[in-house]
Curated annotation (Swiss-Prot):
One of its GO terms (biological process) is protein folding. Homodimer. Residues 1-12 have a biased composition (Basic and acidic residues). It is found in: Cytoplasm. Residues 1-26, 191-210 are annotated as: Disordered. This is Protein GrpE. Belongs to the GrpE family. GO terms for molecular function: adenyl-nucleotide exchange factor activity; protein homodimerization activity; protein-folding chaperone binding; unfolded protein binding. The keyword Chaperone applies. It comes from Mesorhizobium japonicum (strain LMG 29417 / CECT 9101 / MAFF 303099) (Mesorhizobium loti (strain MAFF 303099)). GO terms for cellular component: cytoplasm.
């Protein structure tokens, strides 16, 4: 092969090598951009999956709480109505004069005992369904659980101490079915300062009255 032919072929081979290098570089750049794009999409998918998982967990917790509340408070309205019946039974018993109770009439005594047993059985049934009695005599007055009816001058106990329960209250779970109606001490020594009281249970009766 002549020197002239070699000289003509050399530039062609150099140009081809340069073009091939450019194609390779372009391919690498394209692959890198695709990799960056895929990594970004992967991060977005991971973030979306985490959000969905968090939403599902929140939904599970809300559902569990709703089911628990439904089971706990399903009888709340019925229990409140039954408390009114229990109050009437107790008023009927309290209205019977002592001499009448002490009389020797067997039939009358049996009637009194029947009414008393009925009231106790009703309260026992409510207690089995989560209803608890609030009898706060001697405790510090708490508006979350108690309703003050009057004040009693009593220097022997701290002010705002419950000294008399006019009507017991009742709660179910963390809710107050009916606050205890009480009389509180007035004029005694002040109760020592305490830590801030956490919000109490929902007072359904107070909200209903409002």
């Amino acid at each position: 092969m002549s020197d002239q032919a070699k000289d003509e072929r050399a530039p062609s081979e150099a140009e081809a090598a340069e073009a091939n290098a450019e194609r390779t570089e372009g391919s690498i750049d394209g692959d890198y951009e695709a990799l960056v794009r895929l990594l970004k999409e992967n991060e977005e998918l991971k973030d979306r999956a985490l959000r969905v998982a968090a939403e599902m967990e929140n939904l599970r917790r809300r559902t569990a709480r709703d089911v628990h509340d439904a089971r706990t408070y399903a009888v709340a309205n019925f229990a409140r109505d039954m408390l009114s019946v229990s109050d009437n039974l107790r008023r009927a018993l309290d209205a019977i004069p002592a001499e009448a109770k002490a009389s020797g009439d067997a039939g009358f005594k049996a009637l009194i005992e029947g009414v008393d047993l009925t009231e106790r059985a009703m309260l026992s049934a409510l207690e089995r369904h989560g209803v608890k009695k609030l009898a706060p005599e001697g405790e510090k007055f708490d508006p979350n659980f108690h309703q003050a009816m009057f004040e009693v001058p009593n220097p022997d106990v701290p002010a705002n101490t419950v000294v008399q329960v006019v009507q017991p209250g009742y709660s179910i779970g963390e809710r107050v079915l009916r606050p205890a109606m009480v009389g509180v001490a007035k004029g005694g020594p002040k109760i020592a300062a305490e830590a801030p009281v956490e919000p109490g249970p929902v007072n359904e009766q107070a909200e209903k009255d409002a």
